[in-house]
């Protein structure tokens, strides 16, 4: 039996359509009860969703809201980040798709900060349990009006509906990271 000549072209077109649709992510929060354990030992538990906020709780700490899977309020050090989140409006990044970018500025303490958040790419990387998983890499470039610079990166896993890794560094030599090492459902 001979296959029609157009079949390879049709197959390639369909495969491309499936791949492209797999590289977007609608906003979603982790399922309630899911526990994320970081390399530092800190654990957070998903509690539900309220609009673009995921309701979360730090084990041994308190509840917080995670806006657009990126920014927590209150922050881990207890600071209210409402004004910062309102200025950035990170929910505009959703649905996630490589190449999408938003910009914002924020004034505080007599200074102005400019932010560019971008969905840099869709990539496979090592995740919890050393498994290869699909992620979206989001970068936030922050510049201050006095030459300050920093970059933050989140790797959001569609399968977990959570950032499985976060990295931060600035022009003053400060750096931080948080890596999810275990997920319990």
Please report, for each region that a protein language model flagged, where it lies by residue.
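Prokaryotic Sec-type signal peptides and long signal-anchor helices
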Residues: 10, 40-42, 88
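Short helix-onset patch at the extreme N-terminus, typifying the N->h transition
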Residues: 6-8, 180
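Bacterial N-terminal signal peptides
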Residues: 8-17
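Positively charged n-region of N-terminal signal peptides that target proteins for export
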Residues: 1-5
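Acidic/charged, solvent-exposed loop-and-adjacent secondary-structure segments enriched in E/D, K/R, S/T
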Residues: 79-88
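Acidic, serine/threonine-rich low-complexity disordered tracts
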Residues: 23-78, 94-185
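Sec/Tat signal peptide C-region and signal peptidase I cleavage site
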Residues: 18-22
């Amino acid at each position: 039996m001979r296959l029609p000549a157009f079949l390879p072209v049709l197959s390639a077109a369909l495969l491309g359509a499936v791949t492209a649709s797999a590289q977007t992510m609608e906003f979603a929060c982790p399922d309630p009860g899911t526990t994320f354990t970081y390399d530092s030992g800190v654990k957070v538990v998903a509690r539900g969703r309220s609009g673009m906020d995921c309701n979360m709780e730090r084990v041994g700490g308190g509840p917080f809201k995670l806006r657009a899977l990126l920014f927590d309020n209150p922050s881990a050090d207890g600071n209210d980040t409402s004004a910062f989140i309102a200025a950035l409006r990170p929910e505009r990044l959703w649905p996630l798709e490589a190449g999408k970018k938003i910009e914002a500025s924020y004034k505080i303490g007599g200074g102005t900060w400019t932010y560019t958040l971008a969905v840099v790419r869709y990539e496979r990387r090592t995740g919890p349990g050393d498994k290869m998983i699909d992620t979206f890499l989001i970068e936030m470039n922050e510049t201050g009006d006095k030459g300050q610079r920093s970059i933050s990166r989140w790797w959001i896993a569609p399968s977990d509906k959570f950032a499985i890794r976060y990295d931060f560094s600035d022009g003053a030599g400060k750096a931080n990271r948080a890596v999810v090492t275990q997920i319990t459902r």
